[in-house]
């Protein structure tokens, strides 16, 4: 089975164009439906502390984008849900699987969030299955995203437990070092893992990690993802929560993994690292550029909406796309 499976990553794939049927790229519809809601783009800023905070979450929700709030301000989650609902905005939070999280979930019955993401590094676990069942029993209307996983077996088990979507990606992210520290993961074959998992899935797949260019979003959708979670491309903006650092007159923003010692506050079971990214412009400008690039992708696919990307052919061109090019 494994030996027969094609193994490739984003840089190994080129999508093949179809005849364009729209007069302008602006006619292409990049919206996507997840649960009972429609969002402007199939992208999610990673639920990491240097990517998203409450201010960014509120702005994304107000502007029609999906978001997932990180889980590292545990006491602030319930007030956050309340504030979002007071503004008629969707609430989307993250939980772990520790014992106290069960009481927290039960406490949300009176003001349940629209989305909960169970967010742990190795999501194919009895602890995750147990938490999915608990959330579904306590908050049956809440859309549950579970992860992270990297195999069809994991997707099926989490879906069977009640997950409404699964997040695929073990260690392909820019600040994740799981594959180096443990020898396990989808780093280097993340796109093939998305394809593999999507073929087994009956519910939405969220591709998480390894996205380095806007074209990778289109490739993720081609191989079965409904949404794409992105870290590094969303890090380093003026609004980003990461700490600003100045070196030789140039400003940088910190970006670190959720399993890094900087996140944990201790050097224990570290599977993440910290990097500095040159400060970018505003987040809204990046989202606009992503939309425009995705509209171009749809036009090359010969369609009018994201679904057309799933029907294009592709070629595997091992490590030759870049050919010395850079953006």
UniProtKB/Swiss-Prot annotation:
Q: Which organism is it from?
A: Streptococcus equi subsp. zooepidemicus (strain H70)
Q: GO terms for molecular function, please?
A: GMP reductase activity
Provide the alphabetized UniProt keywords: NADP, Oxidoreductase
Q: What is this protein called?
A: GMP reductase
UniProt-listed HAMAP family:
GMP_reduct_type2 (MF_01511)
| Entry keyword annotation includes NADP | yes
Q: Which residues form the active site?
A: 176
Q: Which reaction does it catalyse?
A: IMP + NH4(+) + NADP(+) = GMP + NADPH + 2 H(+)
Q: Name one GO biological process term.
A: purine nucleotide metabolic process
Instruction: Write out the function statement from the record.
Output: Catalyzes the irreversible NADPH-dependent deamination of GMP to IMP. It functions in the conversion of nucleobase, nucleoside and nucleotide derivatives of G to A nucleotides, and in maintaining the intracellular balance of A and G nucleotides.
Pfam families referenced in this protein's UniProt entry, alphabetically: IMPDH
- Which Enzyme Commission number(s) are on file for it? 1.7.1.7
Enzyme class, broadest EC rank:
oxidoreductase
Which parts of the sequence bind NADP(+)?
A: 205-228
Q: Which family does it belong to?
A: Belongs to the IMPDH/GMPR family. GuaC type 2 subfamily.
SMART domains according to UniProt: IMPDH
Q: Which PANTHER family match?
A: GMP REDUCTASE
This protein's GO cellular component annotations are:
cytosol; GMP reductase complex
